[in-house]
């Protein structure tokens, strides 16, 4: 990808272009003399991408996330193949109104790094963190040599979206290797997995029905309808179901060209059926459990869907989980 | 058949999830149900945290259909729901709402309620837990509890539980609280009794324990060696609007606020670290604080340590206000206090010699509840003698409402050649740092009651010991031959001069909120 693919209007939205060596001074000036703004920060949130077409949407995403999670936001667009090498930076305040008069603001520093290497990315990130605050990185690119030990050993939370990976099998291997490194101590939050949260919650609700619960052992099949490009989410969901049931149900995946990432989940067996369905444009999901003559229906809120909302949701969950890592070998085997 | 665990529940939640449950609200046509309880349950549903196959039954005297009841509640929800009102969600949620008409003293009505609950269980395919919420007037608690017992509804079906949630006021003195506790104990075990105090459901109240016990910098200083005194203020800028004078004039600030809400805050500030976070470990430590309060016995001790007052005509925010005795539904000869300030001592090693000043009042200049912990001054401050430093001790302020947060006042050097020292404030605001709105106190407390976590509910001994302490003061005020004076303050001021004198006598003053 070359620098020429950079869109001037996208760059213009990043705020005030500032020489990298003067970022701290420029940030200070940004706040000086404006008593109506309160600066707040609880985390460092960095987005790393190698796709210049994502610059505008990532910029919007940070604006959305910062409204709920006060942060020092870093947006890094790395274009390793681009020549000649050049590094540019922009600063801006992400503000939201507070009590009518004041604005609560987070800082965003954006970088476009052309022709740089892994060390340059690390230096840039580590030089501009708000000290003592946790570092959350959403690594949007593939886990290549830029994602290396000296970098991930400093990360507290790594956000990925495995459904974006062009070669999921290879990327899952790279992820597992990083997670098993001696110095790695980061939580992994996979947005592909987060997207299934509402389905999992609804499924739990489905089988809270006493009659259906008694028939769990009779379940035989899983049928998941998902949006094209969200196969990993469907696979992760299927692995989770099999793990929970300690079995291996027959899996059928149905791909659709439009609609929500996950559209329906049906578990079926002799005399028992649990269905979770989310219709297009609905913020709710329909849950239906049938067991012989007995039928139970419910309406539950659907989880958020956009990347910004998913990231925001993840930042609200500070507890890590070993569940995801325990599923990786199974997902990896299904990708063979 | 042994009960199966739902394998899909595990791994999903960071908190204990409630199992299928029916909530029965007694006094369902009242203000609390419309303004707080149903909007709280609706918001729990909107967050997806409501247990599956949930039902709520409104129990009251008036004749209504399910549909009529739902329509009334919908109106209340539109006005009061924290997350707004969604017609689609309400449409589904409303199906779980039912109405049951009965007199509180009519056993047949309770038997019919039992049949309705059984019918729900049949529809569910299994028995569910039952939570009885007493939102009726306190005088109705006794007949309701007796009828619940007589109808056999106080026992869960199979291995399911039956619990009761009691709204405040829990008694009006020690004798009535004990009487009520006895009735409750005849019907429900203490572990199934949840006495609600909505202050404990507030995010900042819950944060007091986290602040104290998760931060190593505070706890070593949290004692009489480093803390000079503690102030707890609960100010309201309203009077007796909306007809509340009728109830309030029978209670007063001491019974209405201090015995429950402010004592709960006091115990959270003063308690020893619990051995764990189980409900009883936390409540064991809280009750020790109440027991250690130095009793104020007799009019002299009460007069010296407690200031009561009524407001006279004045203005708040530029709006004229009548005096307390001129308020709607207030006795013109009333001896009830809408303001009280107390100096309390806690006789423990940790708090020896550290006064806790509490004040609560109506028609004060602003609405605010906060705790301020005033640290001792260093033995010597060699820098400056400015009058600006008169009240320059480090102060940790925990704002309960509004603008929830924590502030720490410290001293810093002013820029310049001279060694001038200036107070600065490090301020943490929940709303600035966490964009998401906190759940309403009732949402948290209802979910806790459904999930069986009693940590944020008052235990019997807590309530009775608090009343025991309060009764001595009430006795000195109303039953002694030489009762302490009822002072006055103009509406819109920070209370009577005598409340200021209470601290001034100790060389201190109230924090300016």
For the regions a protein language model found, what residue spans apply to each?
Chain B
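Secretory/organelle targeting and membrane-embedding segments
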Residues: 1-166, 170-513
């Amino acid at each position: 990808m070359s620098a020429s693919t950079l869109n001037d209007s996208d760059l213009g939205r990043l705020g005030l272009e500032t020489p990298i060596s003067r970022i701290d001074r420029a940030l200070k000036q940004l706040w000086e003399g404006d008593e109506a703004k309160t600066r707040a920060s609880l985390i460092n949130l960095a987005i790393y991408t190698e796709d210049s077409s994502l610059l505008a949407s990532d910029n919007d995403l940070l604006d959305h996330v910062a409204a709920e999670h006060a942060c020092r936001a870093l947006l890094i667009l790395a274009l390793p193949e681009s020549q000649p090498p050049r590094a540019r930076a922009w600063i801006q305040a992400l503000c939201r109104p507070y009590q009518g008069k004041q604005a609560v603001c987070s800082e965003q520093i954006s970088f476009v790094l052309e022709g740089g290497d892994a060390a340059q990315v690390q230096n840039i990130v580590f030089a501009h963190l708000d000290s003592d605050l946790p570092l959350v990185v959403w690594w949007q690119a593939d886990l290549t040599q830029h994602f290396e030990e000296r970098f991930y050993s400093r990360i507290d939370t790594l956000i990925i979206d495995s459904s974006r990976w062009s070669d999921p099998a290879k990327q899952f291997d790279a992820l597992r290797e990083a997670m098993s490194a001696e110095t790695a101590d980061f939580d992994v939050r996979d947005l592909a997995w987060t997207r299934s949260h509402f389905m999992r919650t609804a499924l739990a609700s489905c089988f809270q029905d006493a009659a259906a619960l008694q028939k769990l052992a009779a379940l035989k099949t899983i049928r998941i309808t998902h949006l094209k490009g969200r196969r990993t989410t469907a696979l992760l969901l299927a692995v989770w179901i099999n793990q929970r049931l300690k079995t291996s149900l027959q899996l059928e995946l149905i791909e659709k060209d439009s609609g929500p990432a996950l559209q329906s989940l049906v578990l079926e067996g002799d005399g028992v059926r649990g269905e979770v369905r989310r219709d297009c444009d609905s913020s709710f999901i329909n849950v239906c459990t049938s067991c012989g003559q007995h039928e139970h229906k419910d309406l539950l809120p659907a989880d958020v869907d956009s990347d910004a909302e998913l990231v925001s949701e993840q930042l609200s969950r500070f507890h890590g989980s070993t569940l995801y890592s325990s599923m990786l070998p199974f997902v990896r085997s299904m990708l063979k | 058949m042994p009960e199966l665990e739902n394998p899909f529940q595990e791994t999903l939640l960071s908190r204990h999830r409630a199992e299928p449950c029916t909530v029965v609200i007694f006094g369902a046509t009242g203000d609390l149900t419309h303004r707080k309880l149903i909007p709280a349950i609706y918001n729990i549903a909107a967050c997806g945290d409501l247990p599956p196959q949930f039902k709520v039954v409104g129990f009251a005297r008036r004749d209504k259909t399910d549909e009529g009841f739902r329509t009334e509640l919908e109106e209340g929800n539109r006005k009061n729901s924290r997350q707004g009102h969604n017609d689609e969600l309400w449409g589904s949620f409303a199906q779980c709402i039912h109405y049951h008409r009965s007199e509180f003293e009519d056993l047949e009505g309770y038997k019919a309620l039992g049949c309705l609950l059984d019918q729900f269980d049949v529809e569910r395919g299994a028995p569910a837990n039952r939570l009885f919420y007493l939102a009726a007037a306190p005088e109705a608690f006794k007949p309701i509890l007796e009828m619940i017992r007589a109808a056999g509804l106080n026992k869960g079906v199979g291995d399911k539980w039956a619990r009761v949630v009691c709204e405040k006021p829990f008694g009006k003195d020690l004798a009535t609280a004990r009487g009520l506790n006895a009735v409750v104990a005849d019907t429900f075990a203490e572990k199934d009794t949840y006495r609600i105090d909505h202050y404990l459901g507030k995010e900042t109240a819950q944060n007091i324990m986290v602040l104290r016990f998760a931060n190593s910098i505070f706890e070593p200083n949290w004692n009489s060696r480093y803390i000079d005194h503690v102030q707890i203020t609960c100010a309201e800028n309203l009077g007796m609007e909306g007809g509340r004078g009728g109830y309030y004039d029978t209670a007063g600030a001491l019974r209405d606020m201090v015995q429950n809400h402010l004592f709960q805050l006091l115990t959270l500030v003063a308690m020893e670290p619990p051995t764990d976070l189980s409900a009883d470990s936390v409540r064991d430590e809280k009750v020790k604080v109440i027991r250690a309060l130095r009793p104020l016995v007799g009019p002299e001790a009460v007069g010296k340590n407690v200031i009561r007052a009524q407001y006279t005509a004045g203005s708040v925010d530029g709006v004229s206000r009548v005096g307390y005795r001129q308020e709607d539904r207030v006795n013109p000869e009333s001896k009830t206090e809408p303001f009280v300030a107390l100096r309390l001592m806690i006789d423990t090693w940790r708090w020896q010699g550290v006064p806790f000043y509490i004040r609560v009042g109506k028609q004060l200049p602003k609405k605010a509840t906060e705790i301020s912990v005033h640290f001792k001054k260093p033995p010597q401050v060699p820098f400056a003698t400015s009058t600006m430093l008169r009240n320059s001790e480090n102060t940790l302020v925990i704002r309960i409402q509004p603008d929830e947060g924590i502030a720490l006042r410290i001293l810093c050097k002013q820029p310049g050649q001279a060694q001038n020292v200036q107070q600065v404030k490090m301020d943490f605001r929940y709303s600035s740092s966490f964009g998401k709105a906190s759940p309403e106190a009732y949402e948290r407390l209802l979910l806790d009651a459904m999930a069986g976590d009693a940590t944020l509910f008052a235990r019997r001994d807590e309530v009775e010991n608090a009343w025991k302490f309060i009764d001595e003061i009430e006795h000195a005020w109303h039953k002694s031959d030489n009762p302490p004076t009822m002072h006055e303050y103009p509406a819109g001021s920070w209370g009577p001069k005598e409340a200021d004198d209470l601290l001034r006598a100790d060389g201190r003053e109230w924090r300016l909120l």
